[in-house]
Every structure is written in structure tokens, then in C-alpha cells.
Amino acid sequence: MKLRIFILFLFLSLLHVQADVIDSLMTQPRDSIGLTSDSLVLHFLEESGIPISDNNKVKLLKSGREKFIDLFEAIREAKHHVHLEYFNFRNDSIANALFTLLAEKVKEGVEVRAMFDAFGNWSNNKPLKKKHLKKIREQGIEIVKFDPFTFPYINHAAHRDHRKIAVIDGKVAYTGGMNIADYYINGLPKIGTWRDMHMRIEGDAVNDLQEIFLTIWNKETKQNIGGEAYFPQHEEQTDSTNIVVAIVDRTPKKNSRMLSHAYAMSIYSAQKNVHIVNPYFVPTSSIKKALNRTIDRGVDVTIMVSSASDIPF
């Protein structure tokens, strides 16, 4: 059976990776390792203590329309809980439809918890204001800010929650590049069409995403949510659908080199092609070196960036 590996890079974690493990893997000549790109990175992540599961079904959602149709349908089917963690919920048509649906699920007895980053909310042009949060909470939805601003504000600049996680009944999870906003479907006047991707996951990796959500939720709210109801057993996937998933979750000032090295090793070990899609392509020195050496080996390297950016600099 040919395994397909999905490596999901998230922000914020309590993981720690030994520098000597990273360096030892990175300094080995590629040919001497004798591994494919997938297995090389998988070995690196295992040595680094990253949670890896091989009993998963993964669906790639290649547009905002696909993501929100799939997510909303999964929420409609929720029986026990819905957990949402995003950098921001933009106060627009998508968020309004989402909170309306969540309020309906609360009436059915479903637990709904939502968390967003304080800076992410403040920095978007349609933030959730106090009156909006009050209405949401009155409908029985628990919603909290991650790391609200307190003086001195500069102390909170780097420690932000950029995760995009949804977990429904501990059975289905979503993660990827999209927050909650209608511009993932409609685009923006000055920018145009918005290209991003997301993933739907069923299987053991859902537990890893649930653990990430509940760790931060319990820390922020001083609650103690957990137990079997949030971590159900998952059905065994067949060989034809079984996907290996590694959840890479990091915090500022921790594991700062790990993601760069994981990307670099994937590029170094590529044999046919490397395709990169990134709107904010600012490669580190290790990524630049990996790309140059890979090109020198005759591997086709294609990089797609935005023709117009939402960042003014």
C-alpha cells in the first residue's frame, strides 16, 4: 500500500524538539538516507516527538465554497459538541450564518465553544464587537478571546493564535488556511479572487486537533473540559483510504527551526518536482539553499505567489 502523508503545520504548541536531532537529520547526505521525501520527513517528525497517526481519511477542500459547505453540513449533523478556534471570525455574511446555525445546535443540546485571537479580531476590518459577542453568548454559545490585550500591549505582539481548527463530536475535524470570512468565496474588490485550501479529517488525527483546542481552551477559561465524550474511538480505515497525518503545532520562541527544516528536507529529497503556493513567500536561508540545490539537480520547481497582496508592504 502506498501511504500518502499529510503534514499539517499549525501555530502555538507546547512541544519541544532537541536541536541535535534536527541537525543530525539535516546534515546527512540525501542519498545516504535512502528514503523518499515522505518517509524522510516522517522519520524527522517521529524523532522530534510530533504526533503521527496512520488511521485517517482526509479530504482536500480547494476553495472557500467547498470548505464552508462541508463545514456547515458537518455542524448540522453534530450531536454532542462543536469546537471552533480561529484567528478571527469576520463579522460578515458567513459568520452570521455560522452563528445562526450554532445557536440552532445549542437549542438541540449541542455544546458549542468558539475561540478567536484578540489581535486577529482587532486587526480585521469587520471585527466582532462587544454587542455582537453579547448576542452570541445570549444564544448559549461559549465564545472567548485568546490573550486579550492588556498593558503593555507590545508584550502580546508575537504570542498570537493563528490556528484554524474545527472539531465536531470528536469525529470530524477541519484545519488549513481559512478563517471565517466571506472573502474566501467572494474575494475582495482590490485583491480579487481569494485562493486558499482547507482539509477535512476523520480518524485518529482528530484526537490530536481536539487535544490542541482543549489545551488552550482550558487554559484561557480555567475550565477542565475533557474525557471520553470528546475523544471517541475511531473506525479503522481501509487500506485504500488510510492516510498518515502528522500534526505540527508550534508556539513563538519554541520549535522555531523545526518547520523550516521539515520544509527544507522535503525539498532536498524531491526527485521530480516541487510545487509551492504561498501568498507571503519569504523563504529562510535553509529554504533558499534547499531550492537552489534542488534546481541544480534538475528537479522542476514551481512557486505560485499572489499577483496582488492584502499586505501593503
Feature map (PLM): residue ranges:
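Sec-dependent N-terminal signal peptides
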Residues: 4-13
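Charged, low-complexity intrinsically disordered terminal segments
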Residues: 16-313
